[in-house]
Amino acid sequence: AGLAAGAAPEKAAAALIDKDSAVELFAGFGKHVYTAFATIGGNAVGVVAAGEQLCHNCVSKASRFVRLCDAFSVPVLTIVDTNGFVPSASDDIAGGIREAARLAATYADATTAKVALLAGKAVGPVYTALANADLKIAVNGCTVSALEPNAAVSVLYKEEIDASDNIISATNAKAAAYAAEV
């Protein structure tokens, strides 16, 4: 039940790690990302579990933790089940875009072993940033896409959407159908 889509990040991590082996870091910061050192089958790992929407603090927390793991060659397990980055101008002003770019660069630069477990939603830029791993494992029923449905249909069905009387409703209808299909 811990890996069910929408599960709290710490519950998703607890379903995979050895019992009572987790030492959480940065617990009071970036609450929608869980970061901990733990063991899996007796082997030390760094766990990053992302849930809900990620604000600039969540992204900064994950980035710092992955850099720490990489510095000591601790393998990183990333559990992805998130609705993406917080879509708000205030979060962007607070550094959301900069931190998201830093997170993507941190995962790309890390030379330690990286495993991404796609447990629920892994859509859009957050998928690209968090699932940049040596091995990706998708749980049955998860949603994986490099583009958000609205962005995908605006490219795939551009002419059809532009020809409609109501562009917004046509885009939303196509996006819903695309999300159900993919």
Pin down the residues of each PLM region:
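Ligand-binding clefts of soluble mixed alpha/beta catalytic domains
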Residues: 1-182
